[in-house]
Amino acid sequence: ALDTGASKCIVKDLREEFVRDYCFKALSAGAIYEDNYLLGTALARPLLAYHQTQVALEEGADALSHGATGKGNDQVRFEVTYGAFAPHLQVIAPWREWDIRSREDALDYADKHKVPVESSKRDLYSRDGNLWHLSHEGDVLENVWNAPVKEMFKLTTDPMDAPDEPETIVLAFEQGTPVALDGKRLGPVEMVETLNRVAGAHGVGRLDLVENRLVGIKSRGVYETPAGTVLHLAHRELERLVLDRDTLHFKQSISVRYAQLVYDGLWFSTLREALAAFVDETEKEVTGEVRIRLYKGTADPTGRRSESSLYREDLATFGEGMAYDHADAGGFIRLYGLPERVRAMTRDEVTVDVKAVEITKPVGRPGGETK
């Protein structure tokens, strides 16, 4: 930054805050956009934008700037957060204001002004990487029929080249937050880095999808999220074990709305914070362990246990057991199905009355004739 003309450069290590307060919060909420996207980019933007505003206020700056394009979601995520914490500052968005219309234009500008960048015209993918994921967009992926090329991936092994032997891991959670791997307690950053390495080696965490952007267009992205994929799977399995049916089902609806708020750049909204309070309540008993097998691009749960488990073998068994009396089911079914039985009886009574009318009451024909 200093070499390219900046008068001052401030660097902050936000990794711990990012994983602990953003990724793991979204994990506890079960936030997955459109059933697939684990929100790696969407989670990072409010954190970056918030700290931008704090530095700008501390330094007495009169403007904020970002490098997001005019077609994407990131411009919204940055600027909504700017507005939440520094609404008086001017926003400079070069992609919208300068004569830059493509990645080639941006690369030409960088080359002309001696700005070092990793991309080149031989590799025009638009990538966004952080601890939680690595995304790939653009280039050959803009044709949704084109398959991703093998060389594009950075975090995950091709499942065809992954080890021929599966690897089993055990993840431990405390109140919905991952705290240990294979019996070893890990901090948030170390947890994600380790799982990225372990799961990525088995080709776990690849995702190719077409998503609906906030700005109204569809886009295609290929994502690598090894740690996030495994953690979401394990967390979901543990919740199924410890949450009652009504709470679990209602939380699933909350998860969808939570994910949309994050995707749309509304991390600091009142609604997102209110939903987070609900999530915190549901997670109080989500403590336990989940065993997962990693093998050639797949992650499968093979065991789960918790002191808060609502699963009872003596109730679920198909063998002999005295805890559940099968005869009790008959009364439950009659009461549970009573509304349907009443509706059927009411329907039958109406049908009889209608038939009686058809038989006894003459029906007029044109010309006054009756039958």
Each language-model region and where it sits:
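Nucleotide-activated chemistry modules centered on ATP-dependent adenylation/adenylyltransferase
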Residues: 1-371
